[in-house]
Amino acid sequence: MDKKHTRRKKISDNAKATLLRWWIVGMCYFMIGFGTQAGGYTSPIDLIFFLGVGIGLVTIVVYNPIAYNVFDIVRGGEIVNHRYRNKKGWQRALQTLGDLGLSMLVVILVYLSYQNINLFLVGLLGLSPETVVVAGEPFGFATLYTLFYSAITGLTDKLRAIRTGSATV
């Protein structure tokens, strides 16, 4: 019997970093959405605010040091780790504010996605407007968050490349 030696494909560092972000965001949603009173309030603004700030802080304190010091993150053919490592104090402060703002923006986009999905399904199924067909949960939230985050960072990288003149658009 011939034994075939198969070579496993190596998972790229970008995929590992994305999976790490997905896991961290899901964990934050689980802790904040289910473990605090913000998840039970009738006003979604509290949940959006605390999720945005919480995910932003965990990104700054946990994700960025791990992702940019362990993985080689490649965007547009360039390893972008040096953008994180070689920053001065004021640039780190701006990046911190940017990470918080981006987290808030992405959480708002995910919330609006859930709202629109539910409104569509309520109209399609003829249910009462107060019915929540698709409730928030960590897996779906983290998946939508990661998709929106990747789209926004891809767009900002394209805009940065166009601005510096190194774009192949």
Q: Over which residues does each language-model region extend?
A:
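N-terminal first transmembrane alpha-helix
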Residues: M1-E78, V134-A142
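Loop-to-transmembrane boundary segments
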Residues: K9-W22, R85-V110
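Residue-level detector of alpha-helical secondary structure
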Residues: S12, K16, Q91-L94, G98, ...
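Alpha-helical transmembrane segments and their membrane-interface junctions
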Residues: M31-G35, L102-L127
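Extended non-catalytic scaffold regions that mediate assembly and binding
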Residues: I45-V53, L97-L100, N116, F120-G136, ...
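Transmembrane alpha-helix boundary/anchor motif
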Residues: V61-N69, I108, L112, N116, ...
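Cytosolic juxtamembrane helix at the C-terminal end of the final transmembrane segment
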Residues: N69-G77, T143-V169
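Membrane-interfacial, low-structure loops and terminal tails that flank and connect transmembrane helices
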Residues: V74-W90
